[in-house]
C-alpha cells in the first residue's frame, strides 16, 4: 500500500483523489491546500459540474475529510516544506498546484519528509514520464513529472506512427477546453494578452510546449515536432490534430490498422480507437490518454497525413497520474 498526499485540491487534485480512492494499493492520507477550508474541500469533492456528484459518502469532522468512512487529514500550509509528510508516513506527494513543478521547488515535499514526488504538470528540470511511452525508463528518481495532458495524448500516437512509418517532421494543434487560468470576462493577463480575453465567448490562439515535450519522452522525435493550441469554450475534453510527414509511404488504412493493433495490444488502456461519428462530450470521463478518431483523419499523399485524437484533459490525465504513482511506488 502506497501512502500518498495531494498538494493542491483543484481540478486535477480532486479527480486524482476520486481515482486513487478506487485503487486497492493507493491510500490517500492527506491533502493540502492553503486556499480552502475542510468544509469547502468536502463540498468541492462531492459536487463536480463536469464529472457529476461523487457516488460515495462525503463528510468532515474537525480538520479531517471522511470519505466512505476513510479519514483524510486536511492541511492549509502555503509552504510545502512545513508539511508533516514524515510524521504522516507519506511515500509519494502528488503536487497538483501547478506552482511547485521544478526540482528545486518540488524538493520542499522531500524536505517535509515525503520519499518521492509526482508533479502533475510539465517540468523543465524534473524527468518526465508518459505512461505507455517511456515509463520503463524510470530508474528510481525522487522527483518526476507526469508531463501535460496534451503530451499524454500526443506521445502514444506519435510513438506508434514513428515506430511503424517513421516521422520526418510534424505540426500539432490542440483544440483545448478552457481551464482555470483563463478569465470569465476580459481581464489582465500580462504574460499572454489573448489569454486574458473572455474564455466562454472566444476561440483563443495560445502556445503549448506539449509537442516539443514529446521529444523529451521520445528522444528520436526531438526537434521533429512543435505545436500550438486553440482554447475553446467547452468545459472539458480536448482534441489533438497531428499533421505529419512520414518517412515511409503508406495508406490511411494501414495507419488505422497500426493504431488499432496498438490500442488492443501494448497500449490498451492508454490509446483508444474509434470509428464512430463522435463529438467531444462522448469522451467525458474517458480514462484513456488518447482516443484515435479513425474517421476524422485525412491523407493528402502517401507520406503526408493528418491524424485526430481525443482526450479528456481532466479525467484521462488524472488517471495517468495515479498510474505513474503506482509505477514509481513499485520501482
From Swiss-Prot:
D-glyceraldehyde 3-phosphate binds at residues 148-150, 179, 208-209, 231. Its main location: cytoplasm. Pfam families: Gp_dh_C (PF02800), Gp_dh_N (PF00044). NAD(+) binds at residues 11-12, 33, 78, 313. One of its GO terms (cellular component) is cytosol. It catalyses: D-glyceraldehyde 3-phosphate + phosphate + NAD(+) = (2R)-3-phospho-glyceroyl phosphate + NADH + H(+). Coiled coil: none annotated. GO terms for biological process: glucose metabolic process; glycolytic process. Disulfide bonds: none annotated. Keywords: Cytoplasm, Glycolysis, NAD, Oxidoreductase. Pathway: Carbohydrate degradation; glycolysis; pyruvate from D-glyceraldehyde 3-phosphate: step 1/5. It is found in: Cytoplasm. GO terms for molecular function: glyceraldehyde-3-phosphate dehydrogenase (NAD+) (phosphorylating) activity; NAD binding; NADP binding. The active site is at 149 (nucleophile). The record marks 176 as: Activates thiol group during catalysis. Its EC number is 1.2.1.12. Gene3D superfamilies: Dihydrodipicolinate Reductase, domain 2, NAD(P)-binding Rossmann-like Domain. PANTHER family: GLYCERALDEHYDE 3-PHOSPHATE DEHYDROGENASE, GLYCERALDEHYDE-3-PHOSPHATE DEHYDROGENASE-RELATED. Belongs to the glyceraldehyde-3-phosphate dehydrogenase family. Homotetramer. This is Glyceraldehyde-3-phosphate dehydrogenase.
Amino acid at each position: 500500500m502506497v501512502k500518498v498526499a495531494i498538494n493542491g485540491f483543484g481540478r486535477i487534485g480532486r479527480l486524482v483523489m476520486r481515482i486513487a480512492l478506487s485503487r486497492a494499493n493507493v491510500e490517500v492520507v492527506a491533502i493540502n491546500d492553503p486556499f480552502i477550508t475542510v468544509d469547502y474541500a468536502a463540498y468541492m469533492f462531492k459536487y463536480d459540474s463536469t464529472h457529476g456528484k461523487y457516488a460515495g459518502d462525503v463528510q468532515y469532522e474537525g480538520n479531517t475529510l471522511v470519505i466512505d468512512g476513510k479519514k483524510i487529514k486536511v492541511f492549509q500550509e502555503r509552504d510545502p516544506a512545513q508539511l508533516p509528510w514524515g510524521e504522516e508516513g507519506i511515500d509519494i506527494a502528488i503536487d497538483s498546484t501547478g506552482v511547485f513543478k521544478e526540482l528545486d521547488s518540488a524538493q520542499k515535499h522531500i524536505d517535509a519528509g515525503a520519499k518521492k514526488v509526482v508533479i502533475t504538470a510539465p517540468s523543465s528540470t524534473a524527468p518526465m514520464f508518459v505512461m505507455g511511452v517511456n515509463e520503463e525508463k524510470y530508474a528510481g528518481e525522487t522527483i518526476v513529472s507526469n508531463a501535460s495532458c496534451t503530451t499524454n495524448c500526443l506521445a502514444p500516437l506519435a510513438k506508434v506512427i514513428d515506430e511503424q512509418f517513421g516521422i520526418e517532421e510534424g505540426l500539432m494543434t490542440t483544440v483545448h477546453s478552457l481551464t482555470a487560468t483563463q478569465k470569465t470576462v476580459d481581464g489582465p493577463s500580462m504574460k499572454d494578452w489573448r489569454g486574458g480575453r473572455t474564455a466562454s465567448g472566444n476561440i483563443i490562439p495560445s502556445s503549448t510546449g506539449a509537442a516539443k515535450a514529446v521529444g523529451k519522452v521520445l528522444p528520436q522525435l526531438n526537434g521533429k515536432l512543435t505545436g500550438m493550441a486553440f482554447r475553446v469554450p467547452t468545459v472539458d475534453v480536448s482534441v489533438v490534430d497531428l499533421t505529419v510527414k512520414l518517412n515511409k509511404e503508406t495508406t490511411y488504412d494501414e495507419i488505422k490498422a497500426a493504431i488499432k493493433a496498438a490500442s488492443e495490444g501494448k497500449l490498451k488502456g492508454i490509446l483508444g480507437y474509434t470509428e464512430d461519428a463522435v463529438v467531444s462530450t462522448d469522451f467525458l470521463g474517458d480514462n484513456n490518454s488518447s482516443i484515435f478518431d479513425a474517421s476524422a483523419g485525412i491523407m493528402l499523399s502517401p507520406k503526408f497525413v493528418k491524424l485526430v485524437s481525443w482526450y479528456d484533459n481532466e479525467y484521462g490525465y488524472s488517471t495517468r497520474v495515479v498510474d505513474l504513482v503506482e509505477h514509481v511506488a513499485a520501482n
